């Protein structure tokens, strides 16, 4: 299972709320509704999720989410990134981290 992060940048959440919701709904479908929403201030948010979907297929689904004063990047992240995240995100990552014994 791969760890993905979708990071969104916008001028205001009020203005871009529908696009953020569309990104969240796409993540929910890809992750079977198992994801963590992270806020990084009033102009950016990110969603971490695990999925078996290949990166190219996942990225293609997010490329269609576009809007004025809104941008989004989606990428595969390393499992090691969890140690520097909030407790909620670290616990979620720990639950999904692949076992080295499988």
Which residues fall in each region the model found?
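Short, intrinsically disordered low-complexity segments
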Residues: 29-71, 75-78
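Long, contiguous binding/interaction regions
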Residues: 17-25, 56, 60, 80, ...
